Amino acid sequence: MARQLFKRRKFCRFTAEGIKEVDYKAVDLLKDFIAENGKIIPARITGTKARYQRQLSTAIKRARFLALMPYTDQH
């Protein structure tokens, strides 16, 4: 009894929207790439290109450091 998962086509959101640089101040955009528990969702799940995944990771870490985003979920 193998569980079948819904497969959606993966595409890089940043390439599709024409975003050149990921900004740490765009908290609404960054929240889409963070799981409920506060972890960064990997590129193999989101479909983000490697270049943008690196920028995304750095931007999320900067936003966390500046207290724009939480490190973990709400306890």
Swiss-Prot record:
GO terms for molecular function: small ribosomal subunit rRNA binding; structural constituent of ribosome. It comes from the Bacteria. GO terms for cellular component: cytosolic small ribosomal subunit. Keywords: Ribonucleoprotein, Ribosomal protein, RNA-binding, rRNA-binding. GO terms for biological process: translation. Coiled coil: none annotated. Disulfide bonds: none annotated. SUPFAM superfamilies: Ribosomal protein S18. Pfam families: Ribosomal_S18. Binds as a heterodimer with protein bS6 to the central domain of the 16S rRNA, where it helps stabilize the platform of the 30S subunit. Belongs to the bacterial ribosomal protein bS18 family. Part of the 30S ribosomal subunit. Forms a tight heterodimer with protein bS6. This is Small ribosomal subunit protein bS18.
